[in-house]
């Protein structure tokens, strides 16, 4: 089969989607879907994720290069109570395990000139939708397989222009400290006469740290039975997905104290902004370049560069595309 130049360009453009990367490009308001990047700031990062080590940068606000497109990005006028959503580009879906959150930040004036350096507050979040007391699975995440995240503009939102930031965190590489962040910002103007006082207020960057236990989080071993969403609680004038508030039993202390050195596990809570103060070492994420690989060490997966064989009595088990482990 011969491919013309246009076909080759198209295949090249969707190649990141094949690897599981994606970008939020469309805004949806009361059921009406806008064009790609019509009201969402386009960024130079494209489909590529921001890794946990990079979330201390100012680019973590609306993504790399987004201010360059701010002036040409339109501002959508919405009323309090309007249903708003973000949709992924080119039919992609969220096939990375992890939570989703939406933040807002009021611009001091024209949102097109606003860099997001002010205060942010959370208006929505999605975590786990099933009882995970028997062990967390990829399909337990509320976002799994979806292409859209929707919420309602809180009724008491003060009028003015805002950045609205959607963020999905892929925890599939969290065991190695490389959780992936997918995020963009929309520009809106809220009408009405709302007099609410949004909060808790946070700064971006600063809302998370790379070493936070719910960011540097091992979803593979021991299999988690709880998870606490990162960041502040949802503003009381906002909405939190009630299906994500299922509580799971606390982590078994014996498992947490085993020789496996897991990432900290904390009680699942939709509104808690402070993870439980449980202490544990960071997970082992690499293996020798050759020779014998010890039990519970990584032995394969997409992007893994080590080599060797699992020690006697163990075998290399595939947990998912990115993580194989000697167990």
Swiss-Prot record:
Binds 1 copper ion per subunit. It is found in: Secreted. The keyword Metal-binding applies. Keywords: Carbohydrate metabolism, Cellulose degradation, Copper, Disulfide bond, Glycoprotein, Metal-binding, Monooxygenase, Oxidoreductase, Polysaccharide degradation, Secreted, Signal. Its EC number is 1.14.99.56. Residues 1-20 form the signal peptide. GO terms for biological process: cellulose catabolic process. Disulfide bonds join 62-185. Its cofactor is Cu(2+). GO terms for molecular function: cellulase activity; cellulose binding; metal ion binding; monooxygenase activity. GO terms for cellular component: extracellular region. O2 binds at residue 172. Glycans are attached at residue 290. It catalyses: [(1->4)-beta-D-glucosyl]n+m + reduced acceptor + O2 = 4-dehydro-beta-D-glucosyl-[(1->4)-beta-D-glucosyl]n-1 + [(1->4)-beta-D-glucosyl]m + acceptor + H2O. Cu(2+) binds at residues 21, 96, 182. Induction: Expression is up-regulated on steam-exploded bagasse as carbon source compared to glucose. Lignocellulose is the most abundant polymeric composite on Earth and is a recalcitrant but promising renewable substrate for industrial biotechnology applications. Together with cellobiose dehydrogenases (CDHs) an enzymatic system capable of oxidative cellulose cleavage is formed, which increases the efficiency of cellulases and put LPMOs at focus of biofuel research. Residues 291-327 form the CBM1 domain. SMART domains: fCBD (SM00236). InterPro entries: AA9, AA9_LPMO, CBD_sf, Cellulose-bd_dom_fun. It comes from the Eukaryota. Belongs to the polysaccharide monooxygenase AA9 family. Has a modular structure: an endo-beta-1,4-glucanase catalytic module at the N-terminus, a linker rich in serines and threonines, and a C-terminal carbohydrate-binding module (CBM). The CBM domain is essential for binding to and subsequent oxidative degradation of polysaccharide substrate. Lytic polysaccharide monooxygenase (LPMO) that depolymerizes crystalline and amorphous polysaccharides via the oxidation of scissile alpha- or beta-(1-4)-glycosidic bonds, yielding C1 or C4 oxidation products. Catalysis by LPMOs requires the reduction of the active-site copper from Cu(II) to Cu(I) by a reducing agent and H(2)O(2) or O(2) as a cosubstrate. This is AA9 family lytic polysaccharide monooxygenase G.
